[in-house]
Amino acid sequence: MKILVINGPNINFLGIREKEIYGEGTYEDLCKFIKDEGSKIGIEVEVMQSNIEGEIINFLQAAYNKVDGIVINPGAYTHYSIAIYDAIKSINIPTVEVHISNIHTREEYRRKSVTAPACIGQICGFGFYGYVMGITALKNMLSK
């Protein structure tokens, strides 16, 4: 089983930006953690990141018929990218939206996700482990 993890803007600056919100772990730490945990449960995980909306859409479209599921952290695009919403809907691949912080306890403008309705579920507030939760949920759903 293959799962694609897509990270949006500024996720590459983990460990540098807003450590009080996102923690001390770096983006490299996150990628290693996700791949290692996926491997433990028999999942091949590919991780990608872009700060550019169009590239994220390209990642999604390139995944069509190539992966079994997607975990996506759209970053700030969560709150306004109809284009990413449309891309998720168009590829018909089970997708879980993940956020390191709990977006529902953050600033008002961060509490609404326009991309989550295109996904089968949303996980937020569990730090890096939220990605593992998303991968595990996809594995369980796809194995039925």
Swiss-Prot record:
Keywords associated with the record: Amino-acid biosynthesis, Aromatic amino acid biosynthesis, Lyase
SUPFAM superfamilies per UniProt: Type II 3-dehydroquinate dehydratase
PROSITE patterns with a match to the protein in the record: DEHYDROQUINASE_II
Residue sites binding substrate per the record: N73, H79, D86, I100, S101, R110
Pfam families: DHquinase_II
EC identifiers of the protein: 4.2.1.10
Keyword match Amino-acid biosynthesis: yes
Feature type site, description Transition state stabilizer: R17
InterPro entries: DHquinase_II, DHquinase_II_CS, DHquinase_II_sf
Pathway assigned to this chain's UniProt record: Metabolic intermediate biosynthesis; chorismate biosynthesis; chorismate from D-erythrose 4-phosphate and phosphoenolpyruvate: step 3/7
Biological process, per Gene Ontology: amino acid biosynthetic process; aromatic amino acid family biosynthetic process; chorismate biosynthetic process; quinate catabolic process
Enzymatic reactions: 3-dehydroquinate = 3-dehydroshikimate + H2O
Main EC class the enzyme belongs to: lyase
A GO MF term: 3-dehydroquinate dehydratase activity
Keyword Lyase: yes
Active site (catalytic residues): Y22, H99
Alphabetical list of HAMAP family matching this protein: AroQ (MF_00169)
Function: Catalyzes a trans-dehydration via an enolate intermediate.
UniProt similarity note: Belongs to the type-II 3-dehydroquinase family.
Quaternary structure annotation from Swiss-Prot or TrEMBL: Homododecamer.
Name of the protein in question: 3-dehydroquinate dehydratase
Natural source organism: Clostridium acetobutylicum (strain ATCC 824 / DSM 792 / JCM 1419 / IAM 19013 / LMG 5710 / NBRC 13948 / NRRL B-527 / VKM B-1787 / 2291 / W)
Source organism phylogeny: Bacteria, Bacillati, Bacillota, Clostridia, Eubacteriales
